[in-house]
Amino acid sequence: MHAKGLTAADLASYGISDVTEIVHNPDYDLLFKEETAPGLQGYERGTVTSLGAVAVDTGIFTGRSPKDKYLVRDDTTRDTVWWSDQGKGKNDNRPLSPEVWQHLKGLVTRQLSNKRLFVVDAYCGANPDSRLKVRFITEVAWQAHFVKNMFIRPEADELAGFEPDFIVMNGAKCTNPQWQAQGLNSENFVAFNLTERIQLIGGTWYGGEMKKGMFSIMNYLLPLKGIASMHCSANVGEQGDVAIFFGLSGTGKTTLSTDPKRRLIGDDEHGWDDDGVFNFEGGCYAKTIKLSADAEPDIYGAITRDALLENVTVRADGSVDFDDGSKTENTRVSYPIYHIKNIVKPVSKAGAAKKVIFLTADAFGVLPPVSRLTADQTQYHFLSGFTAKLAGTERGVTEPTPTFSACFGAAFLTLHPTQYAEVLVRRMQAAGAQAYLVNTGWNGSGKRISIKDTRAIIDAILNGDIDRVETFTLPIFNLAVPIELPGVNPAILDPRDTYANREQWQEKAQDLAQRFITNFDKYTDTPAGAALVHAGPRR
């Protein structure tokens, strides 16, 4: 699929000069040829696996670098962005001066000048009314492949007149030697300018910086229009019933929303407007550590030609060792969404959600595997966004550690969390949606709750069984927990029963409750936040 008309002069208008060749909107066959070319060195080189997918390495950057993320603070953003240096809540929106931005832009444009470049034009957002037209520019073939997988691929007639709303310039090979004098975190950078509508990447090869970069931008633009912007997966049943799954990386969004009984809308990033829920993306980005055909047949089956594996171990015979986490626990695969058979067609969108599921991976072993939330508890747990940071999704995280991430995606929020909560709750109330808290993490046995039990819990939520069974109230957290559910081991529903004695649970629960209370304090400086304190745990 080749759009016409992009010239060196067009790239010169972005500051990229003397381009030797533009490979514009390459098809998958050309990308395969380019990324596996014999002469490629280092991280540019792709390896063909026995599954047909190409595997690449991203070097030391096997996850995002949130401490290297910056937004230009200017008249556009000064009063709207949730800045890291303002208010109680910590976040990754570090302010950047226009002067330092110009320096970083010069570094990237010089890196891309005098080169053979890959340019991919794509959409972010399945709804034509709110989608972004994004132009990605890179000198690395597999990075072009990544964005072709992950974003929505325009039709030929749409490419013909493509005028980008946003430009992403990936200069992975360049770094910033002046970072210390400029007061930055390191020589690497992921920087955004909402006035110029450009993202710059330097120093990191991790493909997810392009994906999550555009998510951060949608998280800025959509809520200001009253559209919910959500870090969630979504699917739809045969009756048109939509469910959305919130959760941080590794909590099960992709796995649990990929269900043979339901059609997938998307696995990670969605909007919710007057027409319903819609995907931002045209692909999936699934974790592959310990992946097996038996446990996750849909994802395993999607790893064929045109899929792109990251940081996996490829054996000499071309087979992939999915159990090997020696490079990172955050091994990944990107693939176009149509590699999953059971998807919403022709456009990844459906109606309003009726079931809202908050996924948490509780490293403490305190929370029940499932509970039904009241309206106030829904807001409380959405703003709390409790989970465990799982090993490998960010640099430097090698052991599970408890964390609170507002809206189950604080790293990608560009506005204050309460703005996302307010928009989501309005959408839920209008649709009559019900929320549930599902723990995909650990219990008192020290083992992770089995995917078999978690899938049975999700089935009970989606088919309504959970709303028809008797519940008990779990103390301290005041959560309504079902006494039994079809297909779920009854011994795990009350987390207290998974400990040698209930006092052990009580002690851990009081510790975790205090962490919730301490974390939520940052929202009590607003009347809306203060009114929700009662919906949280009490020691």
From Swiss-Prot:
Mn(2+) binds at K212, H231, D268. It is found in: Cytoplasm. InterPro entries: PEP_carboxykinase_ATP, PEP_carboxykinase_C, PEP_carboxykinase_N, PEPCK_ATP_CS. It is an enzyme of class 4 (lyase). GO terms for cellular component: cytosol. ATP binds at residues 212, 231, 247-255, 296, 332, 448-449, 454. The keyword Aminoacyl-tRNA synthetase does not apply. Belongs to the phosphoenolpyruvate carboxykinase (ATP) family. Involved in the gluconeogenesis. Catalyzes the conversion of oxaloacetate (OAA) to phosphoenolpyruvate (PEP) through direct phosphoryl transfer between the nucleoside triphosphate and OAA. This is Phosphoenolpyruvate carboxykinase (ATP).
